[in-house]
A protein has these predicted regions:
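Charged phosphate-binding loop/patch that engages nucleotide di/tri-phosphates or the phosphate backbone
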Residues: 129-140
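Active-site-adjacent beta-strand/loop module that shapes the phosphate/pyrophosphate-binding cleft
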Residues: 24-26, 82-103, 112, 116, ...
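Acidic, metal-coordinating catalytic segment for phosphate/diphosphate chemistry
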Residues: 1-19
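Conserved Nudix-box catalytic region and its N-terminal flanking loop in Nudix hydrolases
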Residues: 27-63, 67
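A generic structural signal for short hydrophobic patches within well-formed alpha-helices
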Residues: 119-120, 132
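A short coil-to-beta-strand element that immediately follows conserved catalytic motifs
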Residues: 72-82
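Conserved beta-strand and immediately adjacent loop positions that scaffold enzyme active sites
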Residues: 19, 27, 110
Length: 140
């Protein structure tokens, strides 16, 4: 299995947020945005969020996983998804290496480990199917 590792410079790409496709036993972790969220309430998406001042996308992705779903993910275990990040202001990564069990914060009301084939059964944020597909393709 060959993986594409790309060093991402947030100044170069000007990413504003970072998100992670977390894969376990072929299933993907999705989180449901709370009903009070301003953008896409009650829709499923990925753990992630905005970069803090001076933060790079890898560190932001790792931090957001811990804050939002209580999973520890080392930045060195995150694989960049250039296909879906290329022309967006959002950096997308995937990983199969994490520790802990999901526990939600106030921003989310549910989480599911789903078979990617079942994604159409959920109300999801835009581009989520393509992002998950890109992550799964990168695993092969």
């Amino acid at each position: 299995m060959s993986k594409i590792l790309i060093k991402v410079q947030d100044k170069e790409k000007n990413f504003q947020s970072a998100h992670v496709v977390i894969i376990k036993d072929g299933n993907v972790l999705i989180v449901k945005r709370s009903d009070t969220d301003q953008w896409m309430p009650n829709h499923y998406g990925l753990p992630g969020g905005k970069l803090e001042s001076g933060e790079n996308p890898l560190d932001a992705a790792s931090r957001e996983c811990k804050e939002e779903v209580n999973l520890s993910v080392s930045p060195k275990d995150l694989i960049f998804l250039p296909k879906v990040s290329k022309e967006k202001q959002h950096a997308f990564y995937f990983t199969t290496k994490f520790s802990g069990e999901p526990k939600l914060d106030f921003e989310h009301s549910d989480f599911q480990w789903i078979n990617p084939k079942d994604l159409s059964k959920y109300k999801v944020v835009p581009d989520l199917p393509e992002i998950i597909s890109a992550a799964l393709e990168s695993l092969q």
